[in-house]
């Protein structure tokens, strides 16, 4: 049985991360994993430093909250990533721990450039964007990959498409979607390795309904299985 740590929390201005964390822990448990919860990176780093987890799932938003749009939230929720937290998380994945990063992960830890190497991509203010929450259709472009085993050719759910991300050239894109009908295809699910750790990023997972949706739940379940097999 693999042990999975679900880190879900951070700024609640647009997401119910507590509900998302519950949904992810429930999904992990349903797939035969032992799941534990953390709501803050400090707690996650302490747990990971103990050496008993096989994978980390990140569904949260810890960032510096630059910009006037976040003035009301910044005092309570702005986050600078301590060096000790960076070292533990990077070492965990680099040395073979798995990572499943959802939705807002490319925005997280925006003061820590290496995090975006770990995830495989980054949100770039002024370039990246997403349309309003709504119905999304994604195309599976790498059906042969274990993360897409048993997933239908096109999936549909209610979520957001993040586009214009700064994506590493060495990731294996598994699914694409468009923000608008005339948009270019945007990578929305990818896999890669960081050190000896396996990583999957899933753009979807805005809320617990998206996580529990059969199409997305299948991807997350497969991702957990893949990242907990040592590369």
Where in this protein do the model-derived segments appear?
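Aromatic-Pro/Gly-enriched surface loop or interdomain linker
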Residues: 1-53
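A glycine-rich, often tryptophan-bearing local segment used as a flexible ligand/cofactor-contacting loop or short
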Residues: 63-149
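Catalytic beta-strand/loop cores that center a nucleophilic Ser/Cys/Thr
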Residues: 28-29, 117-195
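Cell-envelope and extracellular/periplasmic
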Residues: 9, 60-61
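Structural motif
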Residues: 55-59, 201
């Amino acid at each position: 049985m693999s042990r999975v740590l679900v880190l879900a929390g951070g700024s609640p201005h647009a997401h119910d991360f507590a509900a998302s964390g519950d949904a992810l822990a429930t999904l992990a448990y349903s797939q035969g994993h032992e799941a534990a919860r953390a709501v803050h990176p400090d707690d996650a780093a302490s747990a990971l430093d103990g050496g008993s987890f096989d994978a980390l799932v990140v569904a949260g938003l810890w960032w510096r909250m630059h910009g006037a749009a976040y003035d009301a939230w910044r005092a309570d929720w702005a986050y600078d990533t301590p060096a000790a937290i960076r070292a533990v998380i990077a070492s965990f994945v680099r040395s073979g721990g798995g990572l499943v990063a959802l939705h807002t992960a490319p925005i997280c830890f925006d003061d820590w450039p290496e995090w975006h190497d770990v995830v495989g991509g980054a949100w770039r203010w002024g370039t990246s964007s997403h349309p309003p929450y709504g119905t999304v259709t994604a195309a599976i472009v790498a059906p042969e990959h274990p993360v897409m085993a048993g997933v239908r050719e096109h999936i549909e759910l209610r979520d957001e498409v993040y586009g214009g991300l700064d994506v590493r050239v060495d990731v294996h894109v598994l699914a694409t979607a468009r923000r608008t009908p005339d948009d270019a295809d945007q990578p929305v699910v990818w896999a890669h390795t960081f050190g000896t750790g396996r990583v999957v990023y899933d753009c979807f997972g805005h809320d617990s309904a998206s996580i529990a949706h059969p199409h997305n739940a299948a991807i997350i379940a497969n991702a957990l299985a893949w990242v907990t097999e040592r590369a």
